Every structure is written in C-alpha cells, then in structure tokens.
Regions:
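Positively charged, low-complexity intrinsically disordered leader regions
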Residues: 1-50
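Glycine-rich phosphate/dinucleotide-binding loop and adjoining beta-alpha-beta core of small-molecule
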Residues: 2-6, 46-58, 62-162
C-alpha cells in the first residue's frame, strides 16, 4: 500500500490553521503530540521487562514534545533517560513551559554542553530512542554535538521514534 507524505509547508500550515483559525492553543498541540509519541513508545516496549527509553531533546519546539513524552512515560512507570542538548535557558515558548513542568515534577534531565561527553551508554542501553532534537522546520546543516548525537543514534541499532 502506498502512503502519501506531507511537505514541511503543509505541516506548518496545518499547525497555523489549528492555532489561528480553530483556536487550539499551541501548548495543547504540543501536549497531544508528546502524548502520541509516548503511546507509540508504549506499543514498542510492550512485553519488555524493565524497558529503558532514552529521549534526546534539542532546543526547539520539538524538545517540548520530547519533555511531554518523557513525562507520560515516567508517569507510566518506564525508566526514561532524558537529555537536553544545550541549556534549559535556551528554550523558548512552549518548549520552555514543558521543560519547567518537567523540572517542577523533579524528574531527572541532563543537560549536554558542547564540551560534555555524549550519553552513549544510555543510548546503547535503551530499548527505544526518542529523537526530539529537530523538527520539520530544520533547514540548515547539522553541526557540533547535534551532529554527533544523531550519528550515535543512527549507529545504536535501536528502535527510533522521531
């Protein structure tokens, strides 16, 4: 069966219509997206005793989806390792809101700076990796710790949800 794909512009237009014309707050869209990611992870780890999930978040709104997914996974009893590539102070808008919610719940999150080692052990030990580093709007070359992290994810040979 052939599946149709949507373009970046179509996705952005759908978000814009949902927010501006329908009136769905962007924070609600992020919550729904993150919950959907968590539900997909739950499907993929079904039957695994003590599943481990590694969530890798960038600094854009995609990170917010990752924080929401991580919250739902942790609340569902999953051991989730959450990494932010950068500093929490670099997050904006809805991603920053969900980062603060995550922190207020005292869930662990590790910030990875340019000079810090990548969490390769956690990536390799995970049953599922959630890539919340970049979203559909990425339009530049990927450099530095982001590039290295993506290479590590691809080499891990694990189930990846992005």
């Amino acid at each position: 069966m052939r599946k149709k794909a949507v373009t970046v512009k179509q996705i952005q237009d759908l978000d814009k219509v949902a927010i501006e014309k329908v009136g769905i707050p962007s924070l609600v869209l992020m919550e729904n997206a993150g919950r959907a990611v968590a539900q997909e992870v739950f499907k993929r780890i079904k039957g695994i005793k003590k599943p481990r999930v590694c969530l890798l978040c960038g600094l854009g709104n995609n990170a917010g989806d990752g924080f929401v997914a991580a919250r739902h996974l942790i609340e569902g009893g999953v051991k989730a390792s959450v990494f932010l590539i950068g500093k929490g102070s670099g997050l904006k808008q809805d991603a920053a809101v969900n980062y603060q919610i995550f922190k207020k719940l005292k869930y662990p999150i590790k910030e990875i700076g340019a000079r810090q080692p990548l969490p390769l052990e956690e990536v390799r030990a995970a049953d599922v990796i959630v890539d919340a580093i970049f979203g559909v709007g990425l339009n530049r070359e990927i450099l530095g710790p982001f590039r290295n992290m993506i290479a590590a994810i691809n080499q891990a040979g694990k189930k990846i949800i992005s």
